[in-house]
């Protein structure tokens, strides 16, 4: 969250709401009935954490309202009734959801005006394009969204219910095979950090496995909060490989490369060339080193042999949805 015209968000925090597991023993300890974002994260030991956004779509409106309240009053410190608001939504977000979001903004927060934009379209704007296909992969869901002249093509949008959370779960599982047990919601956050700091995508998975078996070049160490040091090897690239091979976690779904290809094939034949040449990665789960090269390699193998393929991975892509929103909302044409 932040202000239109800024080049980076003012506030970045996880969309989590935590509630105390046990009622406060001592009265007047100032224990709140709910904690949001980083505060929920840091007090996770005594809380039950809930994610009001599932697979990119809001499923718990009371908690979502708490998150918005926290955003306006604690993070941005603005009076929402004084500012028009741009919100974003997942592609193919149900109409009822958009209406509910609008209702809360106008009735609870009294905003003067609002607009809801599709996340992937904003990412494309942020990359300086109006035509291309965006692979947006965040925490709960990945989408491939073909966009032509600024408009998403709904019939060709594909959704994959696999993203950051699934990768963290898988890393927890394969670290268990090494004898490192991570089970609680507090420990899952540690594993998420391991993933973000050490995981990478192999250009050739099988070959990388051989390398990992025969040498220690892949191994890295990580210090846990309690000072214990763990060593992680092949897990580093086995974790994000799930994006390309969802069968690793028992999902009968096409990987991100194949989903992107299928999305292009669902688009009008006349614009496919423009899509192949403008494949834009967006979202935190596209931040793995090596992902763009691998994506390029896989799409090249699927596409017609003469096709020019370009995969773009902007360095700021973790926040490119927000940046695109900042650009859009600061246009004078948009404000009217």
UniProtKB/Swiss-Prot annotation:
It is found in: Cytoplasm, Cytoskeleton. GO terms for molecular function: ATP binding; hydrolase activity. One of its GO terms (cellular component) is cytoplasm. Signal peptide: none annotated. SMART domains: ACTIN. Its EC number is 3.6.4.-. Keywords: ATP-binding, Cytoplasm, Cytoskeleton, Hydrolase, Nucleotide-binding. InterPro entries: Actin (IPR004000), Actin/actin-like_CS (IPR020902), Actin_CS (IPR004001), ATPase_NBD (IPR043129). It catalyses: ATP + H2O = ADP + phosphate + H(+). Belongs to the actin family. Actins are highly conserved proteins that are involved in various types of cell motility and are ubiquitously expressed in all eukaryotic cells. Essential component of cell cytoskeleton; plays an important role in cytoplasmic streaming, cell shape determination, cell division, organelle movement and extension growth. There are at least 7 different actin genes in tobacco. This is Actin-104. The lineage of its organism: Eukaryota, Viridiplantae, Streptophyta, Embryophyta, Tracheophyta.
């Amino acid at each position: 969250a932040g202000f239109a015209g800024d080049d980076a968000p003012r506030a970045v925090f996880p969309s989590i709401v935590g509630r105390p597991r046990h009622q406060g023993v001592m009265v007047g300890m100032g224990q709140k009935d709910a904690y949001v974002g980083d505060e929920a994260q840091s007090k996770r030991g005594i809380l039950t954490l809930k994610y009001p956004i599932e697979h990119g779509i809001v499923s718990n409106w009371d908690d979502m309202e708490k998150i918005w309240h926290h955003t306006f009053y604690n993070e941005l410190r603005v009076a929402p009734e004084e500012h028009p608001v741009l919100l974003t939504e997942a592609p193919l977000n149900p109409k009822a959801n958009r209406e509910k979001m609008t209702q809360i903004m106008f009735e609870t927060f009294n905003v003067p005006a609002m607009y809801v934009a599709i996340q992937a379209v904003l990412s494309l704007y942020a990359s300086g394009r109006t035509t291309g296909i965006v692979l947006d992969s965040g925490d709960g869901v990945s989408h491939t969204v073909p966009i032509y002249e600024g408009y998403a093509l709904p019939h060709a949008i594909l959704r994959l219910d696999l993203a950051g959370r699934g990768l963290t779960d898988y890393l927890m599982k394969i670290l268990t095979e090494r004898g490192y047990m991570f089970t609680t919601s507090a420990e899952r956050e540690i594993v998420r950090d391991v993933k973000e700091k050490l995981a990478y995508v192999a250009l050739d998975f099988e070959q990388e496995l051989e390398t990992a078996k025969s040498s220690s070049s892949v191994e890295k160490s990580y210090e846990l909060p309690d000072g214990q040091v763990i060593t992680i090897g092949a897990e580093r690239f086995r974790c994000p490989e799930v994006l390309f091979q969802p069968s690793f976690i028992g999902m009968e779904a096409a990987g991100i490369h194949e989903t992107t290809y299928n999305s292009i094939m669902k688009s009008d034949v006349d614009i496919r060339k423009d899509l192949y040449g403008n494949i834009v990665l967006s979202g935190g789960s596209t931040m793995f080193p090596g992902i763009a090269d691998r994506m390029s390699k896989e799409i090249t193998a699927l596409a017609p042999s003469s096709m020019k393929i370009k995969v773009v991975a902007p360095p700021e892509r973790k926040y490119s949805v927000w940046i695109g929103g900042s650009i859009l909302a600061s246009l004078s044409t948009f404000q009217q």
